[in-house]
């Protein structure tokens, strides 16, 4: 109800805005289901963090490769280069994964993951965000 008020009643937030909520409890399956339904029905993008996960920056961890959200031009170029016709041809990343929440990727957006490689120094991998 609080989220509906911010988006609809008071019109403080628009569909282009991200609402980040920090809670003291763990995020449960019911909350994730509600956030998925909210995105599917109204395109309201809400990220809920457990405060314990904010004690360190996951993006600075040495095991987490660099993630970059592609803009629309890069997305078009990526799809042309790799002949991607359908989004189902791209591996997905859940919008509720810690890295996806940290970079704020929305469902339908593509992120480029730059991983270290023994043979090529770095390798690029791409993932599409799923709701």
Each model region followed by its residue ranges:
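Extended boundary segments
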Residues: 34-78
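Short, compositionally biased
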Residues: 121-131
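Short, surface-exposed secondary-structure boundary micro-motifs
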Residues: 115-116
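N-terminal intrinsically disordered, low-complexity, charge/repeat-rich segments that act as generic
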Residues: 1-53
């Amino acid at each position: 109800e609080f989220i509906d008020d911010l988006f609809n009643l008071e019109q403080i937030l628009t569909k282009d805005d991200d609402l980040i909520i920090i809670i003291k409890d763990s995020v449960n399956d019911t909350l994730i289901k509600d956030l998925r339904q909210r995105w599917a029905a109204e395109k309201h993008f809400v990220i809920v963090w457990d405060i314990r996960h904010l004690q360190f920056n996951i993006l600075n961890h040495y095991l987490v490769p660099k993630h970059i959200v592609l803009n629309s031009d890069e997305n078009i170029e990526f799809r042309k280069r790799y002949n991607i016709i359908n989004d189902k041809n791209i591996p997905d990343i859940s919008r509720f994964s810690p890295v996806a929440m940290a970079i704020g990727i929305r469902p339908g957006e593509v992120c480029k993951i730059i991983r270290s490689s023994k043979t090529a120094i770095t390798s690029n991998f791409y993932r599409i965000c799923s709701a």
